[in-house]
Amino acid sequence: MRVAARFADAALRRVLEVIDRRRSISQLNGLLVAGLVDSVLSANRLADADDGVAVLRKVRLQAVDSPDGFAAAEVFGSYSRGRRMHAIACRIESINSGRWQVVALHIG
């Protein structure tokens, strides 16, 4: 699960950087399923630059059994933006050849 934890941390950091317009949205291709990229775009439009940049603070991972036999994990954590703390969560699943992909995402 260490590989999954490293992937989750890197993916959530990249999502927050895209929302803050520090990275291009194209850098999420392959990390997230297609529909989630659109939701990150909408969060990108709502982000207020006056609040400061998002900084991922804590990430935890819980392995789960998937009914179709693929490895999966629920990921939850927190990030700060300015003086406020926010929640972030996602589900990652192992896809072909041992790669991971974010299949669900919630940004609080």
Feature-to-residue mapping (PLM):
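Core segments of small alpha/beta cavity-forming domains
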Residues: M1-D50
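Amphipathic, hydrophobic secondary-structure cores in small proteins
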Residues: I25-G35, R57, G98, I107-G108
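Extended alpha-helical regions
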Residues: L41, A73-V75, H106-G108
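Surface-exposed, charged secondary-structure patches
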Residues: D48-M85
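Short beta-strand edge/turn micro-motifs at domain boundaries
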Residues: H86-G108
